[in-house]
Amino acid sequence: MELLHSINDFNEAKQVIAGGVNSPVRAFKSVKGTPPFILKGKGAYLYDVDNNHYIDFVQSWGPLIFGHADEEIEENIINVLKKGTSFGAPTELETTLAKEIISCYEGLDKVRLVNSGTEATMSAIRLARAYSQKDDLIKFEGCYHGHSDSLLVKAGSGCATFGSPSSLGVPNDFSKHTLVARYNDLNSTEECFKKGDVGCVIIEPIAGNMGLVPAQKEFLLGLKALCEKYQAVLILDEVMSGFRASLSGSQEFYGVVPDLVTFGKVIGAGLPLACFGGRAEIMDLLSPIGGVYQAGTLSGNPLAVCAGLSALYKIKRDKTLYTRLNALAVRLTQGLQKSAQNYNIALETLNMGSMFGFFFNENAVRDFDDALKSDTEMFAKFHQKMLFKGVYLACSSFETGFICEPMTEEMIDLAISKADESFDEIINGV
């Protein structure tokens, strides 16, 4: 396999695009490689400009639960496209999508559509502060909630990839109201409550940006109780886990009903769309009926709404979808685990529905500190080996992988066999 055209394309991109990419992790910096420049995707496969193809376990970082270029979703988008791309005015499709989302999640009365997960979390926090009339926010080490200033504090994912706990350009005044607790640690969390006047707490119930690290059930239930005790708004960030881990996101596993929730990725099916929502008494504080301002030129645009609605309709029709995706994820993670054991390589694997993760780590990962103990050099070697064998994995050990509906057991078994070859070559210095 060669990447000559991709190398040339990347060099050209770096002349006109900052860093050569429009989102930092895509640069392959942490795996010391060159990113393949993608020509097209179809089903479970990606095709690059060098005529290579890959089994794609990234799926655009999660949105594509039905894989690339799904015919039904594409056809629906094209039909809507013929009527216009954006109107800046209400449409019936928006209301229909809102109803579909609300029907899947307990405690959700109303939603507001936005364009990105960052917008969703930023707006939810503003709303929560207005409702609680308290400024301080608790977040958790390793949880990523987008790149708004107050949330770029020990944010995992891209920050962990580049060895930085925060970001330049964020004034201290922006983050002084952000208190950081340890994930899966109630004592650490209550200490934060005692330190400040906490108005809201935001958490990924299934963290996907320090690798895949699910909350322990007793921790999430305890967090809900602490929020009630201290009269703070609980925000579950399900931008990644919503409609991915299950139809009801984390609620299938934990049964926790938040005050506010954020969704993204799957609800846009690959187009820019996210939302935040919650109890009516909180949501009704939003402008134009309340005093909390939030707006967006392209919010609820018909193309993205149509794509998301098409995906949700397909999900709801397919009663065994999540069972099949989970089975494939289990098959993959167990296969990787067994292969690593054959070469005495320390590897921890897990999945939550169609989300999966693995760490080159001797012990189970419960929080960000555990994740940082992983062997990132081993991950970089493994990633490059797999890439050149036609398996496209997330290019950071602090990211999550995804299964899509077009994948088959044969594809999973092929990926496992390529992992076995990769481990053999790494151990033998090939």
UniProtKB/Swiss-Prot annotation:
<dbReference type="InterPro" id="IPR015424">
    <property type="entry name" value="PyrdxlP-dep_Trfase"/>
</dbReference>
<comment type="pathway">
    <text>Porphyrin-containing compound metabolism; protoporphyrin-IX biosynthesis; 5-aminolevulinate from L-glutamyl-tRNA(Glu): step 2/2.</text>
</comment>
<dbReference type="InterPro" id="IPR005814">
    <property type="entry name" value="Aminotrans_3"/>
</dbReference>
<dbReference type="Pfam" id="PF00202">
    <property type="entry name" value="Aminotran_3"/>
</dbReference>
<dbReference type="GO" id="GO:0005737">
    <property type="term" value="C:cytoplasm"/>
</dbReference>
<feature type="modified residue" description="N6-(pyridoxal phosphate)lysine">
    <location>
        <position position="265"/>
    </location>
</feature>
<dbReference type="InterPro" id="IPR004639">
    <property type="entry name" value="4pyrrol_synth_GluAld_NH2Trfase"/>
</dbReference>
<keyword id="KW-0963">Cytoplasm</keyword>
<keyword id="KW-0413">Isomerase</keyword>
<keyword id="KW-0627">Porphyrin biosynthesis</keyword>
<comment type="subunit">
    <text>Homodimer.</text>
</comment>
<keyword id="KW-0663">Pyridoxal phosphate</keyword>
<dbReference type="GO" id="GO:0008483">
    <property type="term" value="F:transaminase activity"/>
</dbReference>
<comment type="similarity">
    <text>Belongs to the class-III pyridoxal-phosphate-dependent aminotransferase family. HemL subfamily.</text>
</comment>
<protein>
    <recommendedName>
        <fullName>Glutamate-1-semialdehyde 2,1-aminomutase</fullName>
        <ecNumber>5.4.3.8</ecNumber>
    </recommendedName>
</protein>
<dbReference type="InterPro" id="IPR015421">
    <property type="entry name" value="PyrdxlP-dep_Trfase_major"/>
</dbReference>
<dbReference type="GO" id="GO:0030170">
    <property type="term" value="F:pyridoxal phosphate binding"/>
</dbReference>
<dbReference type="GO" id="GO:0006782">
    <property type="term" value="P:protoporphyrinogen IX biosynthetic process"/>
</dbReference>
<dbReference type="InterPro" id="IPR015422">
    <property type="entry name" value="PyrdxlP-dep_Trfase_small"/>
</dbReference>
<dbReference type="GO" id="GO:0042286">
    <property type="term" value="F:glutamate-1-semialdehyde 2,1-aminomutase activity"/>
</dbReference>
<dbReference type="InterPro" id="IPR049704">
    <property type="entry name" value="Aminotrans_3_PPA_site"/>
</dbReference>
